[in-house]
């Protein structure tokens, strides 16, 4: 049996060597994806995003607010405008993401306790930029009122402790668990890169099986395995499994041990998750081809499954907030279970037993070929390829 397995795997290596699709989809594109996403946000968060100022007060207080806003890491004051219309036009031209409006009489209103209003406008076309700039603009607006209050209380002879107690009666002790730096690279690369690698696995698996029919090699392939479909599939996918596993595990080593992404869960769940992710995607590809023994249909199913995974895995929008039918359908995607295991066992370091249902789901995906593998044998021996 092992001799047959070896010869089938060797035959598959020859096929892969002659077909550049394998080289690009299994090595070049995954490496390019890793480099692209890990360097896309290497600084962690966007910095120096352009902001405009409409200062109609021209006072010491307004200038102080502008200087403080410009000092924030994510904000950079790039221009001043005479009125709201000019600033709005700049947002429409994508020259700035937001602008701060300081109306005339702001400083006088603060000193007279008349509660003047300052306004800020921001674009949420880009969700990350909009939310970060909203935070900075809201903070600077709060600081403006606090600065005036501090000046008045200081003039009345209050101590610094008394001033702080008056301005902030309740102190907030804030802790961001898992990712204290709010590093977007930690969120982006750990989901997008594995998802794209899994998409390549989804596509290559039915492609490699379907081309046996397309190029009239199916009978020879089954003859080498002694008409044993399990042996035929195992030998054919063994080289692909080793290559994809190497790419996947090297990616995980790169982000966790070279780039230093947080992984308090340790190495065991990282390695096990990488192995099960590759095997589950290959198994789904085998299942899809056995369900519909057609190169085009099986690849269409797998591409649909891989692309929808990005929306339904819960990384960008929580699955439990979606409608109940969609939440149930989400469990049919390997990437959903990958993401849940990653954020529970690797990112947060919770025990693996907490994600036992998701580990079991990946194992269940690995057993899917049992349902359709005999249909693959029938297709290889009886069916003819129809372009």
Language-model segment annotations:
Residues 2, 6-10, 186, 225-226, ...:
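Alpha-helical membrane-protein architecture signal
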Residues 20-21, 230, 296:
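Residues that define the loop-to-transmembrane-helix transition and helix capping
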Residues 23, 27, 196, 241-249, ...:
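Hydrophobic alpha-helical transmembrane bundles that constitute the permease/transmembrane domains
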Residues 26-27, 190, 314, 330:
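Hydrophobic alpha-helical transmembrane segments of integral membrane proteins
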Residues 58, 250, 254, 262-387:
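Membrane-spanning alpha-helical segments of multipass transporters and channels
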Residues 32-35, 175-255:
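Hydrophobic alpha-helical transmembrane segments of multi-pass membrane transport proteins
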Residues 1-186, 374, 378-381, 386-387:
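Extracytoplasmic/periplasmic domains immediately adjacent to an N-terminal transmembrane anchor
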């Amino acid at each position: 049996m092992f001799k047959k397995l070896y010869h089938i795997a060797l035959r598959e290596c020859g096929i892969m060597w002659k077909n550049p699709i394998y080289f690009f989809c299994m090595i070049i594109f995954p490496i390019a994806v890793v480099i692209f996403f890990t360097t896309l946000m290497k600084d962690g968060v966007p910095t120096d995003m352009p902001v405009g100022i409409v200062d109609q007060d021209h006072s010491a207080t307004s200038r102080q607010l502008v200087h403080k806003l410009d000092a924030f890491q994510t904000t950079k004051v790039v221009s001043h405008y005479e009125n709201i219309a000019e600033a709005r036009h700049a947002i429409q031209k994508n020259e700035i993401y937001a602008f701060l409006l300081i109306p005339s009489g702001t400083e006088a209103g603060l000193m007279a306790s008349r509660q003047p209003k300052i306004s800020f406008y921001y674009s949420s076309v880009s969700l990350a930029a909009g939310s970060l700039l909203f935070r900075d603009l809201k903070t600077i607006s709060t600081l403006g009122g606090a600065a005036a209050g501090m000046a008045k209380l200081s003039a009345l002879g209050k101590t610094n402790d008394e001033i702080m107690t008056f301005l902030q009666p309740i102190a907030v002790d804030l802790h961001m668990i898992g990712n204290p730096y709010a590093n977007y690279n930690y969120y982006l690369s750990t989901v997008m890169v594995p998802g794209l690698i899994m998409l390549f696995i989804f596509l290559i698996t039915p492609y490699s099986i379907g081309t046996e029919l397309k190029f009239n090699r199916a009978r020879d392939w089954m003859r080498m395995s002694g008409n044993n479909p399990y042996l035929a599939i195992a030998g054919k996918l063994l080289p692909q499994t080793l290559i994809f596993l190497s790419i996947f595990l090297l990616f995980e080593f790169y982000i966790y041990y070279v780039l230093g992404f947080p992984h308090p869960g340790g190495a065991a769940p990282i390695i096990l998750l990488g192995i099960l992710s590759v095997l589950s995607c290959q198994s789904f590809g085998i299942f899809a081809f056995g369900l519909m023994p057609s190169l085009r249909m099986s690849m269409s199913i797998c591409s649909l499954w891989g692309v929808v995974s990005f929306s339904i895995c819960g990384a960008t929008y929580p699955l439990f907030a979606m409608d109940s039918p969609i939440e149930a359908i989400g469990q049919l995607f390997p990437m959903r279970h990958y993401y849940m295991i990653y954020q529970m066992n690797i990112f947060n370091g919770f025990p693996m037993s907490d994600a036992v249902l998701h580990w079991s789901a990946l194992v269940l995906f690995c057993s899917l070929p049992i349902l359709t593998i005999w249909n693959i044998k029938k297709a290889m021996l009886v069916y003819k390829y129809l372009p």
